[in-house]
């Protein structure tokens, strides 16, 4: 699992004074989703985590300080905090995974399974993000080979698949 906090924004509210929202990017098993959290939510998580695992220090909250430089330092500190929790703990607590909106799948014995893969899918937030492993610049079956030399292996395989009743030349 990889966690980053690429940005933050100031949110104004009619009911209370404004606050800062941190955008958390979570990458897990080739999937990426975003979660937005306030500093108070990070602080509440930290208090709960301290009871069950060893936690790094959380950046301090400067009371009502919306100076961009201070907020950027806090963003970096919170990102480092999340990454340190992941690095220092082999098994992450459920409340940490819930904070990041990650579905917790307990490890099962090899004889058990979850049924269909679709049941373990999370909703919209888990879109695949991957890169192609193999890329053809031209269709190898439609366009002829650029070289004049015949590809004996491919011809043999195609001959064996499509014309098994004929003897090779």
From Swiss-Prot:
Location of this chain's protein in the cell: Cytoplasmic vesicle membrane
Ligand binding (a 1,2-diacyl-sn-glycero-3-phospho-(1D-myo-inositol-3-phosphate)): 38, 40, 61, 74
Record's comment describing the protein's domains: The PX domain mediates specific binding to membranes enriched in phosphatidylinositol 3-phosphate (PtdIns(P3)).
The keyword Transcription is annotated on this UniProt entry: no
GO biological processes: protein transport
Protein's name according to its UniProt entry: Sorting nexin-24
Gene that encodes the chain: SNX24
Domain PX: start-end pairs: 1-125
Main location: membrane
Function: May be involved in several stages of intracellular trafficking.
This protein's GO CC annotations: cytoplasmic vesicle membrane
Entry-linked PROSITE patterns: PX
Topology with respect to the bilayer: Peripheral membrane protein
UniProt similarity note: Belongs to the sorting nexin family.
Organism listed in the record: Bos taurus (Bovine)
One Gene Ontology molecular-function label: phosphatidylinositol phosphate binding
Annotated keywords: Acetylation, Cytoplasmic vesicle, Lipid-binding, Membrane, Phosphoprotein, Protein transport, Transport
Pfam families recorded: PX
Xref: PANTHER family: SORTING NEXIN-22 AND 24, SORTING NEXIN-24
Keyword Amino-acid biosynthesis applies: no
UniProt modified residues of type Phosphoserine: 113, 116
Modification sites for N-acetylmethionine: 1
